[in-house]
Regions:
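Membrane-helix interfacial "entry" motifs
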Residues: 4, 54-65, 90, 94, ...
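Membrane-interface loops
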Residues: 34-37, 83-168
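Phosphate-binding glycine-rich loops and adjacent basic patches that engage nucleotide phosphates
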Residues: 5-14, 74-80, 106-115, 161-162
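Lipid-exposed faces of alpha-helical membrane segments in multi-pass integral membrane proteins
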Residues: 70-80, 104, 108-112, 171-182, ...
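Alpha-helical transmembrane segments of multipass membrane proteins
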Residues: 19-22, 109-113, 117, 180, ...
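Transmembrane helix-loop junctions and nearby membrane-interface residues
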Residues: 24-31, 80-86, 114, 118-122, ...
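N-terminal transmembrane-helix/juxtamembrane module of multi-pass inner/ER membrane proteins
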Residues: 1-74, 117-129
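Membrane-embedded catalytic cores of phosphoryl/pyrophosphoryl-handling enzymes
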Residues: 6-13, 27, 128-222
Length: 222
């Protein structure tokens, strides 16, 4: 278990460095004013090609907006589970560590979102409301992968031995995650690199959560 924990942390670090390197490339390589209001976009040739190929699809935008709400409701469900455990067990220390870590994980995801709202790498390829909006990394991609991905981890813990339910929940959750990410790309409200950056970032964050859970469980067995 200790070896697994160390391996997970190494993978987390590698994914984090990969995201940082990709972000640096997007911010500095082939930057051209191809966005709305002449906003500059990195890897402009690639992003222009993908945007021209996919166009803008309002239906997929609406679908992914609803799926984003489903992801948030899923997170609230696990928050409610933690609250129920706290009420029943009457001590924060008796709440399942993986649920406490999940709460910290959600906070970390929110902080990352706020950071990239301030530190803008790319603006959206379309203007949706009032003016330019931050687009990198795709927040819906990050939310979908982070929330649905960690939800699958909880199912594998709390539904152990219930094979049918586990298969159903895994399949539905993985489908929701995939449709959200692919649908967000097809919607045309993000550049291709926004989606790719979101996938890399959320992969690093999920591995960080998995590493923390593995570490805590390893410590408990010592």
């Amino acid at each position: 278990m200790e070896h697994k924990s160390k391996r997970n942390f190494r993978i987390t670090g590698a994914l984090g460095l990969l995201f940082a390197a990709f972000t640096a490339i997007v911010a500095t390589v082939d930057v051209s004013p191809i966005g709305p209001e002449q906003s500059s976009v990195g890897l402009a040739a690639l992003n222009r090609f993908a945007a021209g190929l996919l166009g803008v699809n309002p239906l997929w935008y609406d679908i992914t907006e609803w799926l984003g709400a489903v992801a948030v409701l899923s997170a609230l469900g696990f928050a409610a589970l933690g609250l129920c455990q706290l009420i029943r067990r009457r001590s924060l220390l008796k709440v399942d560590p993986r649920i406490l870590l999940l709460g910290a994980f959600y906070i970390a995801v929110a902080l990352v979102y706020l950071f990239f709202e301030r530190v803008i790498i790319n603006y959206r390829p379309v203007i949706l409301d009032a003016g330019l909006e931050a687009s990198y990394p795709s927040s819906h991609t990050v939310i979908a992968i982070c929330i649905f991905g960690t939800a699958i981890m909880q199912f594998h813990h709390y539904l152990r031995g219930k094979t049918v339910w586990l298969v159903i929940m895994d399949s539905v959750t993985a489908l929701l995650m995939a449709v959200t990410v692919i649908g967000r790309l097809l919607s045309g409200v993000h550049w291709f690199t926004d989606i790719a950056g979101g996938v890399l970032l959320s992969s690093a964050l999920i591995m960080l959560y998995a590493s923390a859970v593995s570490y805590v469980e390893c410590r408990k067995k010592v």
